[in-house]
Swiss-Prot record:
Its EC number is 3.4.13.21. InterPro entries: Class_I_gatase-like, Peptidase_S51, Peptidase_S51_dipeptidase-E. It catalyses: Dipeptidase E catalyzes the hydrolysis of dipeptides Asp-|-Xaa. It does not act on peptides with N-terminal Glu, Asn or Gln, nor does it cleave isoaspartyl peptides. This is Peptidase E. Keywords: Cytoplasm, Dipeptidase, Hydrolase, Protease, Serine protease.
Amino acid sequence: MELLLLSNSTLPGKAWLEHALPLIANQLNGRRSAVFIPFAGVTQTWDEYTDKTAEVLAPLGVNVTGIHRVADPLAAIEKAEIIIVGGGNTFQLLKESRERGLLAPVADRVKRGALYIGWSAGANLACPTIRTTNDMPIVDPNGFDALDLFPLQINPHFTNALPEGHKGETREQRIRELLVVAPELTVIGLPEGNWIQVSNGQAVLGGPNTTWVFKAGEEAVALEAGHRF
């Protein structure tokens, strides 16, 4: 499988997806036809989200079609060489994808050679479940099971920092709560600016920041760029 799972879409001082464009270009391998799944968008319309994505990827020669615009979404997925899933609200993304019957077709198409690109919520959707999203559950997705393309759970935008005086839980504490009730899971705390690239059966960590791996009953383990999962 070919996956590019990004923690986030924007870095300080850079344009939207700018840091990801070299990674995307390197993994295209001649692919040009893409479908974009914009359902995580809440405060922007799906048309706006699709148009923005198409504009950014056009210089790479990628032709982007919004899945919500086509008459036959399943046929569009089958024909697509690239499947792109944008960030936003993970619960809405999963709900819309499930209700439209897209989960199994997307997973199948990626397993048969389509490149999957997802950032933030799109990275969450590639995991076995969305249980490590940071998002508010604004809708009920009728279950948390997702695409299961990547075998570990990703927590995007990972940071353990708290504002001064803040008394809420740290991100690690939230993850530890999950591991109490689901000790079989492994969670990757993927900070902004980092990514996981899967190609030729190898999953490799990239990015400038330390990534953390959490398992039940174990201390967190720090990983740096180049680590192979």
